[in-house]
Amino acid sequence: MMHYTGTIWRPPYEASSLLLEVTVGCTHHRCKFCTLYADLPFRFRMSPLEDIEADLKEAQKMYRRVIGRKVSRIFLTGANPFVLKYDRLMEIAGLTHRYFPEAETIGSFARVTDVALKSDGELAALRGAGYDGLTIGVETADEEALRFMEKGYSAADILEQCRKLDQAGIEYYFVYMTEFRLYDRACGEGQGILECGEQRKGI
């Protein structure tokens, strides 16, 4: 059996991807609205490389003998696997290519702060190793809402780090909460309209 800890979350568009556990939980774990990893007895944990390799071996058997189709994409599970150091991510990519050489891309959830930890050269190398299609929960471009919900970054940070991804050729998808401020008493009524304007300016 493959290692899966707690509730496994993935975007709808990753339904056909091979789900590979490389982290469990979230390094930030302070967003006021989020309860996705509340069922875990710890905040964040990295999977041992031997567990990752064992899961790839198991998945190889399952896909080739039972499911009968090739794997074109692998999705790393956990709230933000992209926080892992460059060397670790490259090791994981090496393992995925060893057992699934046909896999074209590797995706994951990522925080804006995870991208900030990587240099431009490292991001380009990660793209070359197959990392592409990151899902980033930016939620909003409104500074007050970002602070209130304790996201841990600013709207300017979102733009800066996503430009780094653009330069590296790494695609990404945003998760937006379109009414993030609308029902927030601290921000006042009608702020959802204001927020949409701020998001348009950011985009």
Summary of predicted features, one role per range:
Residues 5-54, 58:
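Canonical Radical SAM [4Fe-4S] cluster-binding loop centered on the CxxxCxxC motif
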Residues 90-95, 185-202:
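Short, electropositive alpha-helical surface patch
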Residues 113, 137, 141-147, 165-195:
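Conserved strand-turn element in the central/C-terminal portion of the radical SAM core barrel
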Residues 61-160, 166-167:
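Conserved SAM/AdoMet-binding glycine-rich loop
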Residues 44-47, 85-87, 147-150, 184-189:
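Short, solvent-exposed loop/turn segments at secondary-structure boundaries
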Residues 126, 165, 197-203:
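Generic structural signal for hydrophobic
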Residues 52, 89, 119, 158, ...:
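Aromatic/hydrophobic pocket-lining residues that form the small-molecule binding cavity
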